[in-house]
Amino acid sequence: MLQTPSNLNRFKHLGLALSIFYLLYNLTTVYSVSLHTLYPSQIHNLTTPFDSMIPFIPAMIVPYSWSLILFVASFFLVRTSTQLSLLAYRLILATIFACLIFYFYPARFSFSRSIPDDWTQFGYQFLQLVDKPFNQLPSLHVSYAMLLGVSLWNVFESKKRWISVAYRLLLTSICTLIALSTVLTYQHHLLDMFGGVVLAVLVLILSNRIRNALVIKHLILGVIGFLLIAIAGFYFANMSMIASEVVEDLAIMIASYWLISFTMLAGVYQQVKPIRDIRWFQKSSSGRLTLHTWIKFAPIIIIYNGMSLFGQWYFKIFSKSQKYSLTPYAINDKVNVVASPRLMQTDLSSHLTYWLFGSSLLELRSSLESNRPAVCHQIIVVDLAAEISSHTHNLEIAANGIMNTTVHYLYLPLLDLQPLNDVLLQDYIDLFQKIEALIQSVETQAITANNESWVEGNQVEDSQVKGGLITLINFHCVMGLSRSIGVQVLYLLYCGTLTVYNYQSWIEQHYPHAHLKDTYLPQSLVETMANYKSVTY
């Protein structure tokens, strides 16, 4: 069943599309005006002999003004959430690609246009005030007209065929008049119009292949960052008395690096089932991002490290009010699990002490003072954060500072906000089976060591040895709000500890801060994992 978007969702999509347009369009306009003032020879002239044959028709200011009206109205005319998302994708892609071209190929309308002395003069006066004669190729009016026409083509259906035909003829006429008005009002040249058509066709092809909003999000961030850095470098260079070319070139290099990194990340999100291919975010055996990964994604890694610091602050604030407690959950008397953000070195020791021994060290002291074997611990760190290094290395140091504890490291590179059903089920099963193998392995090793100790007269029952072994499984991501909790829930479903009937109430009880929407942790994945019970506790 097709889902009808809410008015709030329509306004959100409209606000995003308009915000990106006004930010980037005005940014490139200001840049072009400054460039024309300082270096007029760098502004291109796109006049052709055919442009002089085109008449100026003042009344065409009316259909020219329809562009914004149709732009806004289209978000309330589409009928389904899919149509709404596709509409927003198309308009945003056209905007960011056009503004990149405006930066790399700045052009200016070359004809002089006098303001008519009739009823249209107010429209042209307003146009002259808000729209400078730059940002020419491609014409966004033309691109938007084509994209809006295609996006609205199927939104109106009637049992009477002539009504549907009339609607489409009206839509075609409006979009055609908008496109023609760009040259008949002397706002654009013919090449600009042609460029707008080409851009619209490319966007239509690309938008139908984009998997989700995360791809668009990172393309937007890449283009916005590029333009802000490059244009800021241009102004700093022209304010600098020395080495102005060096400053501008350096800014362009940094901006290009930013754009390439975010474009590559968008490409990773575009991949279907990308987890098996971990070459994008490689890590060492101790969970540290490799140099190769840093070279590719340094801007993203720096941003996520900042988010990690924010996550630490978030945790401390809510832990004071006891709303956010990193308390391990006991699957049974041998295995505990806990989901967390990536923890800082300064916080690891206190967290680890609490995870292993609770609020005091009485258990540890009593085991050391008695003749019974001390409780032995092993820690399995499951790293789910592709964008930052794990805390495994520092946790191992902290664990050895408290007592001799074995730390194992497992890595499943999930991308931020990537729906958990994007991962192959077998990847989850492989991870969970590795966890089970480590749990079984440490028990076997402990029993073997106990059997070898008989010569010293210290042998104890195997049941006592098993009872003295505790495994702590730490699922961690960047901020501890989605990935770590979501995969922990899947593991508990896999173990049979949770069911499809109680997992949501369990999340609300243990992680009320969690950000797990149905689109992120879909019911279908929960049901599949709950039915895949290979271990009985």
Predicted regions span which residues?
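Functional transmembrane or membrane-interface alpha-helices that line membrane-embedded catalytic
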Residues: 162-163, 167-170, 195-220
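Aromatic-anchored segments of alpha-helical transmembrane domains
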Residues: 22-26, 95-103, 173-183, 227-236
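Membrane-interface loops
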Residues: 33-49, 77-172, 178, 204, ...
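Cysteine-based protein phosphatase catalytic domain of the PTP/DSP
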Residues: 120-129, 142, 310-447, 467-475, ...
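PTP/DSP superfamily signal
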Residues: 211-308, 317, 430-451, 467-474, ...
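N-terminal transmembrane-helix/juxtamembrane module of multi-pass inner/ER membrane proteins
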Residues: 1-70, 115, 120, 124, ...
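Membrane-embedded alpha-helical segments of multi-pass membrane proteins
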Residues: 62-70, 139-147, 194-198
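Interfacial helix-loop-helix junctions of multi-pass membrane proteins
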Residues: 134-137, 176-203
